[in-house]
A protein has these predicted regions:
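Short, P/G- and charge-enriched loop/turn segments at secondary-structure junctions
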Residues: 82, 199-200
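C-terminal structured domain segments
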Residues: 140-198
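Residues in intrinsically disordered, low-complexity segments of regulatory proteins
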Residues: 48, 52, 161, 216-217
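Outer-membrane beta-barrel "beta-signal"
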Residues: 151, 155-157, 201-218
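Extended hydrophobic secondary-structure segments that form protein cores and membrane-embedded regions
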Residues: 1, 29-34, 166-175
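Tryptophan-centered motif/residue detector
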Residues: 117, 177, 217-218
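Detector for outer-membrane/organellar transmembrane beta-barrel domains
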Residues: 2-137, 143-151, 155
Length: 218
């Protein structure tokens, strides 16, 4: 593969402002960020393939910019608890596939209520939603959406503290997506989706998962 002259990248700049609120029932944190330059495309993990196209096509995203808004927090009332996470972002002017200038916006929201059963156990639920829309220079656009619902039995040293770790979760999760290739079932020849390794799967827009998860912080 022949590479063109490497593009000249400008320095990336990030300006962030955060506000922390602490009150008797819990806490809440709000963050607003403005990102200018090539790193404006990285929040969705786009950095690797943007670097690739920059080397191959000689592009850069020096004029790209992004706004991000984050809000998350927790609240506790007796044996009941509640946590949430909200994220919104909008960006434009970054290089995508080939030489197109792209813009995107995305929103996600997750809530996680729980009920403490004993000092070391609790029942928790999790509801989540996301949507992302990307617009291309040629006028075309793509939209992806997904939802999830989880119910879990959780063991931890202090079940009333959402930060308590290590944590063992036994869970069942329902997933739904409008991108049928995001969720796949057992191999099938009826509706072909060929993966990179040549495996053929049948696409689907929903999935149920049972599992166990061990999480530790240090």
């Amino acid at each position: 593969m022949k590479l063109v002259d490497q593009p000249k990248f400008s320095n990336g700049n990030i300006l962030a402002v955060s506000l922390d609120n602490y009150y008797s029932l819990g806490s809440c944190k709000t963050v607003v960020q403005y990102i200018k330059g090539p790193n404006a495309a990285t929040p969705f993990g786009n950095g690797s393939w943007i670097d690739y196209w920059s080397l191959v096509k000689g592009n850069n995203s020096n004029d790209a910019h992004r706004w991000q808004f984050l809000n998350y927090g927790d609240m506790k009332i007796g044996d009941f608890g509640f946590a949430h996470s909200l994220y919104y972002t909008v960006a434009s002017g970054f290089e995508g596939w080939e030489t197109s200038k792209e813009s995107d916006k995305a929103f996600s929201f997750v809530v996680r209520p729980y009920y403490k059963l004993t000092d070391i156990s609790k029942i928790t639920a999790e509801l989540g939603f996301f949507t992302e829309t990307t617009k291309y220079q040629n006028g075309e656009s793509e939209n992806y959406q997904g939802q999830k619902a989880t119910l879990a039995y959780v063991l931890s040293p202090d079940a009333g503290n959402w930060k308590s770790r290590p944590e063992l979760r036994f869970y069942v999760t329902y997933l739904h997506s409008n991108d049928t290739q995001a969720l796949v079932e057992s191999p099938s020849q009826d509706k072909k989706v060929v993966m990179n390794d040549g495996t053929t799967y049948a696409p689907r827009d929903n999935q149920v998962i049972f599992g166990a998860q061990l999480e530790a912080w240090w």
